[in-house]
């Protein structure tokens, strides 16, 4: 998560010179060797806020792979990468990924995803189609309880919530290439 610098050796110029880099071991970490805050830090921060706040919802869910995921290769940038995590009652999250290490991806355009659930069918989006920018990813909630108000789905990523004495506030983030939509049954 944070790059660094090996200290200079006392008896030889480099410590462990056969096993590790001479001095720098930054590796494009979210926080650079000299404290630089990179874009990946901000992207991970949003994801970590989500996982921290909604741990119980995520851990109660099981992963369901798409048919495409079972045969997809890393070089296949044409096929949408997605999986679902759903709990036994039918609440869940749609994970979309348009990034692949060491492969040049393209914008995913004009697609939709339909999920069958015990609570009912959910089509992302209800009408029309979605777009997901090159190298973007998203975790979209469906059949999600917002303090007793059931959200059928959102095409914005749930980030965290804040609770005050008078209300609970939910925070979402727009996904690159995607229009934000919130649908209640």
Indicate where each model-derived feature is located.
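Carbohydrate-binding surfaces of carbohydrate-active enzymes
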Residues: 1-185
């Amino acid at each position: 998560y944070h790059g660094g610098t090996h200290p200079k050796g006392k008896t030889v110029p480099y410590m462990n010179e056969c096993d590790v880099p001479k001095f720098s071991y930054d590796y494009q970490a979210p926080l650079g060797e000299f404290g630089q805050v990179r874009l990946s830090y901000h992207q991970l921060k949003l994801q970590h806020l989500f996982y921290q706040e909604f741990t119980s919802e995520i851990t109660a869910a099981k992963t369901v792979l798409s048919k495409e995921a079972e045969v997809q290769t890393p070089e296949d940038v044409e096929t949408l990468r997605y999986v679902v995590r759903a709990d036994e009652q039918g609440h869940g999250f749609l994970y979309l990924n348009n990034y692949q290490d060491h492969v040049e991806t393209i914008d995913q355009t004009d697609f939709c995803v339909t999920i069958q659930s015990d609570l009912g069918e959910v089509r992302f989006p209800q009408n029309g189609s979605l777009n997901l920018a090159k190298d973007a990813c998203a975790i979209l909630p469906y059949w999600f309880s917002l303090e007793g108000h059931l959200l059928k789905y959102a095409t914005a990523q749930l980030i965290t919530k804040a609770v005050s004495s008078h209300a609970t506030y939910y925070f979402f983030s727009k996904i690159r290439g995607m229009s934000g939509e919130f649908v209640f049954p």
